[in-house]
Amino acid sequence: MATDLKLVVGLGNPGAKYAGTRHNIGFMALELLGERSGFSFRQQAKLHGLAADTGVGEQRLRLLMPQTYMNDSGRAIRAALDWFGLEPHQLLVLVDDMDLPLGRLRLRAQGSAGGHNGLRSTIQHLGTQAFPRLRIGIGAPAENPAERRVRTVSHVLGPFSKVEQPCVGAVLDAVLDGIQRLQRQSFERAGTWINGFRYDLEPVD
């Protein structure tokens, strides 16, 4: 049986300053979906974000990019669930994950914030960890823990390199494919495909 997916939220920070950064890969996925499907996002004050919808009937999907900044994403998600009369299990959050290499995806039905402020805010506002999230690997700035801490902010708020762009494109394609699979397949079956996705960067000479 297909999942009851009704709302997809991409996490990120608003404004041109953050466009295309690693932290905004959730936004990038929804923007690509809009470009390919021919719809545009509009500011919805009551939802604290840019919203759109696609599909009809049982395949209708609400889309949201919170404009609250990452650390307050949960406020927009709570507002959207309330406005559309949805439950947390009908939600999918697209979120960057520094603990996953670029080129990997992880679908989970629930879980902790894992140090991600956008997920932390969402858990706080929903009052539960039980909502699906698709973690999109962006890679870590360093393997050494101390160096990683120092470079985390500049890493997540920085752009993808030219070498990484083909991988980013493949990842975004896979995210959109994964969303379609979640609409047609069970969570477990879609998750098997999503979690098995792998795109390796070409080695640099």
Swiss-Prot record:
Q: What InterPro entries does the record point to?
A: Pept_tRNA_hydro (IPR001328), Pept_tRNA_hydro_CS (IPR018171), Pept_tRNA_hydro_sf (IPR036416)
Q: Which terms does the UniProt entry file under GO BP? A: protein quality control for misfolded or incompletely synthesized proteins; rescue of stalled ribosome
Q: Which of this chain's residues are annotated to bind tRNA?
A: Y18, Y69, N71, N117
Q: Where is this site: Discriminates between blocked and unblocked aminoacyl-tRNA?
A: N13
Q: Where is this site: Stabilizes the basic form of H active site to accept a proton?
A: D96
Keyword Hydrolase found: yes
Please name the SUPFAM superfamilies in this protein's record: Peptidyl-tRNA hydrolase-like
State where the protein is found.
Answer: Cytoplasm
The record's annotation in PROSITE patterns points to: PEPT_TRNA_HYDROL_1, PEPT_TRNA_HYDROL_2
Give EC number(s), comma-separated: 3.1.1.29
Q: Which terms are listed as keywords in the entry?
A: Cytoplasm, Hydrolase, RNA-binding, tRNA-binding
Residues annotated as the enzyme's active site: H23 (proton acceptor)
Q: Does the keyword RNA-binding apply?
A: yes
Q: Which reaction does it catalyse?
A: an N-acyl-L-alpha-aminoacyl-tRNA + H2O = an N-acyl-L-amino acid + a tRNA + H(+)
EC class of the enzyme, as a word: hydrolase
Instruction: State the Gene Ontology terms under molecular function.
Output: peptidyl-tRNA hydrolase activity; tRNA binding
Identify one Gene Ontology CC term for this UniProt entry: cytoplasm
Q: What does this protein do?
A: Hydrolyzes ribosome-free peptidyl-tRNAs (with 1 or more amino acids incorporated), which drop off the ribosome during protein synthesis, or as a result of ribosome stalling.
Subunit composition and interactions:
Monomer.
Protein family: Belongs to the PTH family.
Q: What is this protein called?
A: Peptidyl-tRNA hydrolase
Q: Which gene encodes it?
A: pth
